[in-house]
Design a protein with these regions (language model features):
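Short glycine-aspartate micro-motif
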Residues: 34-38, 44
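A short acidic/small-residue loop/turn micro-motif
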Residues: 60-63
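Active-site-adjacent loop/helix segments that line or gate small-molecule/cofactor pockets in enzymes
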Residues: 15-19
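General beta-strand structural signal in soluble alpha/beta enzymes
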Residues: 9-14
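Short secondary-structure boundary segments
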Residues: 39-41, 140-141
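ATP-binding/phosphotransfer module of carbohydrate and carboxylate kinases, centering on a glycine-rich
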Residues: 1-7, 21-31, 47, 53, ...
Length: 194
């Protein structure tokens, strides 16, 4: 591939590619620490910090942080390892199993999105406390439900409860944001020819 493209080629996870794209071409340009979380058929995350993608011993398993279930939520969770992790409770298949319909068909059901926002905000609170990102970008099919963003921001602020006070957290609309590059056209780019 390197010979055909005349440039270095590497492989990584899709979400690391997403966070790198946002830092390089998108709304996270100039940020030193950014987290990208995709919530769709599963949940995955990429972390960019001080010019590098975070790998550690493996890639971050951000979808498997444990969540405290709401008492009224009788859904067991679908993750075969944890049941009550973010992916097991909040990914698209979990929404469909819990409510009996796909997320796209539940847009007008506020109870669905209140619960979803609560679980996502719990996970984001953990990431804020441990990763300390300057921006959190949310992508994936579930996040196409635009009503989720204000609900997540509100719950995240409640969960942080004033423990951390920063300019970023004071401006939640620019702190927890939707992915920006999915709607960008790349027709202006020219690939090398052989």
């Amino acid at each position: 591939m390197q010979e055909a493209l005349h440039c270095p080629v590497g492989f990584d996870t899709d979400v690391n590619g997403s966070v790198l794209g946002e830092v390089t071409f998108g709304q996270a340009q100039g940020k030193k620490c950014v987290m990208y979380l995709t919530i769709g058929t599963g949940v995955g995350g990429g972390i960019y910090s001080n010019g590098e993608l975070h790998h550690g011993m493996l890639h971050p398993e951000t979808g498997h942080v444990l969540i405290t279930k709401r008492t009224a939520d009788t859904y067991a969770g679908r993750c075969p390892y944890h049941k009550n992790c973010l992916e097991g409770l909040a990914a698209g298949p979990a929404i469909e199993e819990r409510w009996g319909r796909k997320a796209v068909d539940l847009a007008d059901c506020p109870e669905v999105w209140e619960l979803e926002a609560d679980y996502i905000a719990q996970a984001l609170t953990g990431y804020v406390m441990t990763v300390s990102p300057e921006m959190i970008i949310l992508g994936g099919g579930v996040m196409h439900q635009e009503q989720l963003f204000p609900l997540i921001r509100k719950k995240l602020k409640e969960y942080i409860n004033g423990y951390i006070v920063t300019d970023e957290l004071a401006d939640m609309e620019h702190y927890v944001v939707p992915a920006s590059l999915h709607a960008v056209s790349y027709t202006h780019l020219t690939l090398p020819t052989t």
